[in-house]
Each structure stands twice: as structure tokens, then as C-alpha cells.
């Protein structure tokens, strides 16, 4: 199988992180459990149930369910504001043109993933996807990354992960996959590097501009060599 580039979506390809923050702020306020936006932001990209449990300080199950439902409702109301991050579409097309698989390795629910895919408008280059239904616990646990590898039919030595969150880097590392970091989700370079992401770029466009210096280029050379030997 062709080597694969595994992409997180929220905050990595689509400018959605701060809409999630807004939705969670509203949901927590509705329950009389106000949480500062900066605290929520630092949890974005984490498994949803883990985020709720952490920020609600283990509130009763029915409260956690209402929090999740409130987030979904407020997020859906704001999806008209979603947009691809600079260079996102061009990056996906370039990766596909290099003979690599484009895999959306996200733990977003199916309904959110459908919206994100419409925003990206890149269906012709996407090989495989994952969603929240594929694992019981998502990032920072490595399960969703392993599912993405399995769907692509490759091992960790023939893949690289691209993500914007500490949780992305930790999940990728747990599955043995190198991680390229992006600042577009609002997390500091130093934090991404400490979690294992290297190198780190500003956004998809910055990564695209420096693609030849990354593992993506190495995987493309491997794919080209394998194709020539056929």
C-alpha cells in the first residue's frame, strides 16, 4: 500500500477550534458550571467524554450528557463560520499528487465530520477517514491513530501524523507514528514540541511551503521508488 499522511482535522485543516470553545462555554454556562474559555481551549482535541469529565469535575452522568448535547447544539449553530485553514486544500492535493494516501484521522462525531468534509471540499483526494465511533476513547489515547493506520493498510514506519494539539502528538507517539505539529489550533510551539511534535509549522500553507524538509517528502520518495520497482 502507498504510505499515508494522517491528518487531524479540527484546528489542523479547518479553523474550528475556537468555535468549539464557544460551544463548550455556552454548554457549561447552561448547566451553571462556568468554565473559563482558556481552560476549555487547552482541552480541545481531547476525547470529548474525557474533556467533559475533566472540566465538569466528574459531574453526574446526566449532567455530562447534557453538556455534550449542549456543545453539539451550539456548535451546529455556528458551523456557517467554518473555513479551511490557509493552504489546507492545496496541501491535501499535493500529498495525493505525491502518491501518498490522505487519511483524515479524526475523532469527530460522524455529523461533525460530514460538515468538516464539506468545508474542505477535497473528497477526490481523501483515501480513508475515522470518526468517534471507531474507538471508545479517542486522543490522547493512540487508538484512533491505529485505526487510521489499519484503514490505510500501512504500519507506523510508512506514515506520518499532522496535528495541532498536544493530544495529537501524544496519540501519534503512542502508536509509534512521527507527528508534524501546526500552530493553527492555538497551542504554543514549545508545548507541541514537548509532546513529541517535530517539526512545527504555522499552518497548512507553511507546511506546504516547506514540504521537502519533512517526513512527507521522505515518504513520497519511498512511494516513487516502490512504484518504479513494479
Feature-to-residue mapping (PLM):
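N-terminal helical cap/lid subdomain that shapes the substrate entry/recognition surface
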Residues: 2-100, 122-123
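Substrate-recognition/cap helix-loop segment adjacent to the acidic, metal-dependent catalytic center
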Residues: 29-31, 51-58, 81, 89, ...
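Phosphate- and divalent-cation-binding pockets in alpha/beta enzyme and binding domains
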Residues: 23, 51, 111-115, 171, ...
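Structural recognition of alpha->loop->beta junctions
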Residues: 121-129, 191-208
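Short amphipathic alpha-helix with an adjacent loop that forms part of the alpha/beta core around
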Residues: 209-218
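Conserved Rossmann-like nucleotide-cofactor binding loop
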Residues: 12, 19, 110, 167, ...
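Acidic, Mg2+-coordinating phosphoryl-transfer loop and its flanking beta/alpha structural elements
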Residues: 106, 160-201
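Non-catalytic pre-domain segments flanking phosphatase-related domains
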Residues: 1-7, 217-230
Amino acid at each position: 500500500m502507498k504510505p499515508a499522511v494522517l491528518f487531524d482535522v479540527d484546528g489542523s485543516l479547518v479553523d474550528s477550534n475556537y468555535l468549539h470553545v464557544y460551544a463548550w462555554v455556552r454548554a457549561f454556562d447552561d448547566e451553571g458550571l462556568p468554565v473559563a474559555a482558556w481552560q476549555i481551549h487547552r482541552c480541545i482535541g481531547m476525547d470529548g467524554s474525557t474533556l467533559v469529565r475533566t472540566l465538569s469535575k466528574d459531574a453526574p452522568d446526566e449532567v455530562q450528557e447534557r453538556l455534550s448535547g449542549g456543545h453539539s447544539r451550539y456548535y451546529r449553530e455556528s458551523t456557517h463560520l467554518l473555513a479551511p485553514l490557509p493552504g489546507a486544500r492545496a496541501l491535501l492535493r499535493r500529498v495525493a499528487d505525491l502518491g501518498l494516501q490522505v487519511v483524515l484521522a479524526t475523532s469527530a462525531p460522524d455529523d461533525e465530520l460530514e460538515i468538516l468534509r464539506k468545508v474542505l471540499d477535497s473528497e477526490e483526494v481523501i483515501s480513508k477517514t475515522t470518526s468517534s465511533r471507531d474507538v471508545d476513547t479517542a486522543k490522547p489515547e493512540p487508538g484512533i491513530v491505529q485505526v487510521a493506520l489499519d484503514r490505510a493498510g500501512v504500519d507506523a514506519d510508512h506514515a506520518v501524523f499532522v496535528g495541532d494539539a498536544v493530544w495529537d502528538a501524544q496519540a501519534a507517539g503512542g502508536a509509534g507514528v512521527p507527528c508534524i505539529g501546526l500552530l493553527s489550533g492555538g497551542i504554543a510551539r514549545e508545548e507541541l514540541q514537548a509532546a513529541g511534535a517535530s517539526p512545527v509549522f504555522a499552518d497548512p500553507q507553511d507546511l506546504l511551503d516547506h514540504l521537502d524538509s519533512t517526513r512527507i517528502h521522505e515518504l513520497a520518495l519511498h512511494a516513487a521508488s516502490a512504484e518504479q520497482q513494479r
